[in-house]
Amino acid sequence: MTAAATRIAIITGASSGIGAATARGLAAAGYRVVLTARRKDRIEALATELHEAGHDAVAYALDVTDRAAVDTFATAFKKVAVLVNNAGGALGADPIATGDPAHWRQMYETNVIGTLNVTQALLPALTASGDGTVVVLSSTAGHGTYEGGGGYVAAKHAEHVLAETLRLEIVGTPVRVIEVAPGMVKTDEFALTRFGGDAEKAEKVYAGVAEPLTADDVADTITWAVTRPPHVNIDLLVVRPRAQASNTKVHRES
């Protein structure tokens, strides 16, 4: 167990995909991981898995869009070393002309307001740690657009701006802000959720792409960035599969 063992890393959206993989990565790096998500059964199962592997983990059911719940949660921690803002997601792929405003609102609430809520609530504890790290998991959608992605792109652009502005505002404090922006990542739920459970549409997203990123690939990236020396700030790390050159340029094998 490393010197990080007594230090706390909080991961939002830890019930599956990148969040769960990041929890495993940070636990292996020696952090005491705090798993948060709405699906309590999932994070409790992950906490059990981590305990059985010899790691320190605890699960908290939390909806990041519920500010009162977030504030109550934050009172449990005097010092936090790492916050990974992973909770988020996409809904729908309709053009702007016909997009569902409810989807846009929900994506903004989860990706942006959720990140804002948790970051604001835990910033005092991150500062108190003496060398806190805020990770914002954005997306390449936060750095370029694509047809049918308006709502998600808008939310992720806002999340990118949140990270960039926070870094400017807290410079000189013992907290760094790291933005990790993944491209095409194939997880069990992202595309399936985006298309309302339509497995055929979800699979088409990755059709012909030999090796899209995995949740573990992104988790490795986050863990690497977090474990740099405290004076080193990875402002922005964009990670894509080799087959993807941009949001709209992807090599697909026939």
Regions flagged by a language model, labelled:
Residues 15-16:
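Conserved glycine-rich cofactor-binding loop
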Residues 31-45:
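Conserved glycine-rich Rossmann-like NAD(P)H-binding loop of the short-chain dehydrogenase/reductase
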Residues 40, 60-72, 101:
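The beta1-alpha1 cofactor-binding region of Rossmann-like NAD(H)/NADP(H)-dependent oxidoreductases
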Residues 94-96, 100-105:
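Substrate-binding pocket helix/loop in short-chain dehydrogenase/reductase
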Residues 119, 155:
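Active-site helix of classical SDR
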Residues 139:
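Residue(s) in the substrate-gating loop at a strand-loop-helix junction
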Residues 179-180, 199-248:
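C-terminal helical subdomain
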